[in-house]
Every structure is written in C-alpha cells, then in structure tokens.
Amino acid sequence: MARSVVAALLVLLSLSGLEAIQHAPKIQVYSRHPAENGKPNYLNCYVSGFHPSDIEVDLLKNGQKIENVEHSDLSFSKDWSFYLLYYTEFTPNEKDEYACRVSHVTFPTPKTVKWDRNM
C-alpha cells in the first residue's frame, strides 16, 4: 500500500513539473504562395515549440489587428511543446505592412514579427 501511494505521489509530482517548464515560441510569418501585388494569397503565422499552452496570436495589417483570422487546433509535439497556425486571406501590395504579434508568458512584452515578402 505504501509503495503505491509513493508511486502515485511521484507521478503527480512529475506531471505538475511539466507546468513549471517554460519554452518561448518560435514565430514564423510567411505567405502560402510567392507574393504578387494585387493577387489574393494567404498570410500564415506558425507558432511552435512553446510551453505552457496559454498564448495569444494576432495577425496585423499596418499595426492594426486583422479580424476574421482562422487558426488550427492547439497541438503538441513529441516533446510536449505546443504549436498553432493562424492564417487569413490577404492581397499584398507595395504599401501595406503585415506582421504577427504573439503574447506568451516567456515574453516580457508581446513580440511582433514582420512578414518578409521575399521569403
């Protein structure tokens, strides 16, 4: 009986330790197709390798939050870190700037990564 109690406590302690691990998200911003001015495309923000799972992701156009953004379900990798894809349809041009802003416990302030049309 005592062994099973000790084993159960060890399992609980190891599981609670997962929440203590924090990994900053890797942020990748890219378009589905090569950018062509005036041609509809999709803007993607792939956020991966983060822990814990609480995260806020916004796609931005000229610094303003884009509405009607879709995202994948929250998923996890073999190492128990999480990943998500946020995306929206957009039509690139020369004057507009697009970016992805991410808020996570590992960042003191939200981190913004700009879309590079040449990537």
Swiss-Prot record:
Leader peptide range in chain numbering: 1-20
InterPro entries: B2Microglobulin, Ig-like_dom, Ig-like_dom_sf, Ig-like_fold, Ig/MHC_CS, Ig_C1-set, MHC/Immunoglobulin
Disulfide bonds: 45-100
Primary residence: secreted
Protein keywords: Disulfide bond, Immunity, Immunoglobulin domain, MHC I, Secreted, Signal
Cellular compartments annotated: Secreted
GO terms under cellular component: extracellular region; MHC class I protein complex
Domain Ig-like C1-type: 25-114
Similarity comment text for this entry: Belongs to the beta-2-microglobulin family.
Subunit (UniProt): Heterodimer of an alpha chain and a beta chain. Beta-2-microglobulin is the beta-chain of major histocompatibility complex class I molecules.
One Pfam family matching this protein: C1-set
Protein purpose: Component of the class I major histocompatibility complex (MHC). Involved in the presentation of peptide antigens to the immune system.
Full protein name: Beta-2-microglobulin
Natural source organism: Saimiri boliviensis boliviensis
GO biological processes: antigen processing and presentation of peptide antigen via MHC class I; immune response
